[in-house]
């Protein structure tokens, strides 16, 4: 769980892994452990939300850690996990600001967060660094959503040049860009 922040969760994957290690554990037992971790406020569960169907889905949830320091203590710090860590930070910040947070499903694509608060809805994509290779993956799920709710791309990019290049590629007025550091400080 700590090694997979930002990824969808499957109890079957856990039970299959343990079975290969010579241990037997049911999916229900895995979920019991997860509920216990949630009750102890060590993890938070984000369920999937079908954006087109406007309904909660029962599978492929994600779990985020309440304290990333625990993760670093258990598995160590890894530079290559920074994208998942950033996603975890954004999730916790949305909760702190009073949003109810889901992960979004838009056809076959994923929107990192669908955040709801009273009459507001906000769609958020979190990306460590926007590159020509990942720009389409980050923007397409937001562009495929035709409602008028706010859409935000959070990235660690801070150079205005980067944002201008992206706007040239995706010339739409429906997106906000904000360096994640500044967004976190609001």
Where are these regions (language model features)?
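Active-site ExK catalytic segment of metal-dependent nucleases
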Residues: 120-131
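Domain-level recognition of nuclease-like catalytic cores that cleave nucleotide substrates
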Residues: 158-186
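Hydrophobic/aromatic beta-strand patches that form the interior of the parallel beta-sheet core
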Residues: 64, 124, 152-154, 168-170
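Nucleic-acid nuclease catalytic cores
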Residues: 106, 148-165
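Arginine/glycine-rich "motif VI" loop of SF2 helicases in the C-terminal RecA-like domain
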Residues: 140-149
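Accessory nucleic acid-recognition modules appended to NTPase machines
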Residues: 1-121
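Active-site-adjacent loop/helix micro-motif of nuclease/hydrolase catalytic cores
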Residues: 130-140
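Short active-site-adjacent structural elements
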Residues: 111-112, 132-134, 160-163
């Amino acid at each position: 769980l700590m090694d997979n922040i930002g990824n969808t969760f499957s109890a079957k994957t856990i039970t299959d892994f343990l079975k290969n290690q010579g241990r037997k554990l049911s999916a229900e037992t895995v979920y019991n452990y997860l509920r216990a971790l949630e009750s102890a406020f060590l993890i938070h569960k984000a369920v999937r939300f079908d954006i087109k169907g406007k309904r909660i889905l029962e599978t492929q949830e994600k779990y985020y850690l309440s304290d990333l320091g625990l993760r670093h203590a258990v598995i160590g710090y890894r530079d290559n996990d920074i994208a998942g860590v950033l996603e975890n930070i954004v999730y916790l910040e949305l909760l702190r600001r009073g949003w109810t947070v889901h992960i979004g499903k838009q056809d076959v694509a994923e929107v990192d967060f669908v955040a709801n608060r009273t009459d507001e809805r906000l769609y958020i994509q979190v990306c460590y660094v926007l590159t020509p290779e990942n720009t389409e993956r980050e923007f397409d799920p937001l562009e495929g959503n035709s409602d008028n709710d706010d859409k935000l791309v959070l990235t660690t990019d801070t150079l205005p040049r980067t944002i201008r290049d992206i706007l040239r590629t995706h010339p739409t007025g429906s997106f906000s860009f904000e360096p994640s550091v500044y967004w976190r400080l609001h």
